[in-house]
Amino acid sequence: MPAWLRSLGGQASAFTDRIPWVTFPALRFLTKTLHRDMRVFEYGSGGSTFFFAERVRDLVSIEHDPTWAAKVEEALRVQCSNRPPVRLVEPESDADAAESDPADPDGYVSSDPSWRGWTFRRYAASIDGFAEAYFDLVFIDGRARPSCFKHSVAKVKPGGLLVVDNAERPHYRHIHASLEGPLWRKLDFAGPGPYNLYFWQTCAWQRLSASSGQP
């Protein structure tokens, strides 16, 4: 039975299957690409945290939800010998954030209506303490993704990858536009993915130059 059909039955999830919730083409690419010498930073913890921890040298995992972070931490403690810490960076209440555009990298807000009036500025900026060109891969699959992109793009080393899930969403157009040109190579992994009946798009950009292309 194809993996897609298997994933649609029962109670399977990315968390129970210990995989990132990306399209199947992206999952195959990541499985083939990751290796033990890599440093990875991820916005959004879960099945991807196990997946990366089992395959790379260093992992920094950022999570905004305290209940979910505790669940992931407990599962890592029990089931993962190479247990990375999950760093909890909660959003902060901000009345001005209610008027911000989730497509604006300077907005620091989520497109999820349940987070209206909350700012993810500290969450997006959690990568700022690392040197430029430090990570082999930055995985953006959490909140306020355009803002996370703004802070993380310069942290990808030459030859490294920046991966954005759900890249087809209109409010991520800034990311696509910012990485056009000779400094980055785009890898488009559109198609089906586990646990969903619909197709979506996961994109990876490989940094080809020592310059990130950002101002």
Language model regions located:
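Class I SAM-dependent methyltransferase Rossmann-like catalytic core
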Residues: M1-D37, G107-T119
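Aromatic-acidic/polar surface patches that form glycan- and anion
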Residues: I19-T23, S45, G142-R145, P194-Y195
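SAM cofactor-binding core of SAM-dependent methyltransferases
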Residues: F24-A97
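Short, contiguous clusters of charged residues that form electrostatic/catalytic patches at enzyme active sites
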Residues: F24-R28, F50, R121-A125, A133, ...
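Generic enzyme active-site microenvironment
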Residues: V40, S61, F139, V163-V164
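Generic detector of well-ordered alpha-helical packing
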Residues: Y43, H64, G142, N166-A167
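S-adenosyl-L-methionine
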Residues: E73-E132
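C-terminal substrate-binding/active-site "lid" region of AdoMet-derived donor-dependent transferases
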Residues: I127-L137, R143-P215
